[in-house]
Design a protein with these regions (language model features):
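Beta-strand-rich extracellular passenger or scaffold domains
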Residues: 1-238
Length: 238
């Protein structure tokens, strides 16, 4: 399916599922390609199983769920816009400020996903990563919920912002690779939530920036609410 300089809207009703692609056929003719825009609407589910790396346009999940059944199948989303305007580009957006009454979810299951360009999650967005799954980000931020037993990785030299305790609700690790920066933002309520359910952060030569996080209470140390491990990492703003 080729999407040129146009918008393809997938409006899927609640309790309905549309499947595109075949995990056993890399050359499936129903894979996605092009430079346009994909918008997921409706409360139903869109399942993407094909190799969609020829799609370099933008994608917005405004309502319902998008499930990725194949690893690294949307690596290049956003590339066309980011090449022409690198200072103001988006790749994949989960949720929306315009339709904040809806719930939008990106479900990667146990697949391995890398997003070269921005992965942005709004307050009504959900990113689900199951055990064995990993999402590698290079830029962007998430203010919605990140959940599951999988792993979120900030790639080498990347930069990512997590806002609110709900964005740090993984039972798996958040890994910050060499020269990458993970910034956390939140208030006292977020801190209290994190203290009751600490997030594991592994610094593999990366930087954890707490400059925009709330002041830590009383005798609390900077990692109160965080389980920090790894080697060669740096914590700033604590």
């Amino acid at each position: 399916m080729y999407i040129g300089h146009s918008v393809a809207e997938f409006n899927i009703a609640a309790d309905k599922t549309l499947v595109i692609g075949n995990t056993s056929n890399d050359g499936a003719i129903d894979s996605l390609a092009g430079t346009g825009v994909i918008v997921k609407e409706g409360a139903g589910e869109l399942v993407l199983n094909a190799d969609n790396n020829a799609f370099t346009g933008e994608m917005s999940i405004q309502n319902g769920e998008v499930t990725l059944g194949r690893s690294d199948e949307l690596m290049n989303v956003g590339d066309t816009h980011c090449q022409s305007d690198p200072q103001d580009c988006f790749g994949l957006m989960v949720g929306s400020t315009v339709h904040s009454e809806y719930q939008a979810e990106l479900n990667v299951g146990n697949t391995q996903q890398t997003f070269v360009h921005s992965l942005t999650g709004f307050a009504n967005g959900i990113l689900n990563i199951d055990a064995g799954g990993n999402v590698t980000v290079n830029q962007g931020g998430f203010s919605g919920s990140i959940q599951g037993e999988g792993q979120l990785t900030v790639a080498q030299d990347g930069s990512y912002l997590l806002t609110g305790a709900q964005s740090m609700a993984l039972t798996g690790d958040i890994v910050v690779e060499d020269n990458a920066v993970l910034s956390l933002a939140g208030n006292q309520a977020d801190l209290r939530a994190m203290q009751s359910d600490p997030q594991s952060i592994v610094l593999n030569g990366g930087v954890l920036d707490l400059s925009d996080f709330t002041t830590w209470d009383g005798d609390s140390s900077y990692n109160d609410g965080l389980q920090i491990s790894g080697s060669g990492g740096t914590v700033i703003g604590s």
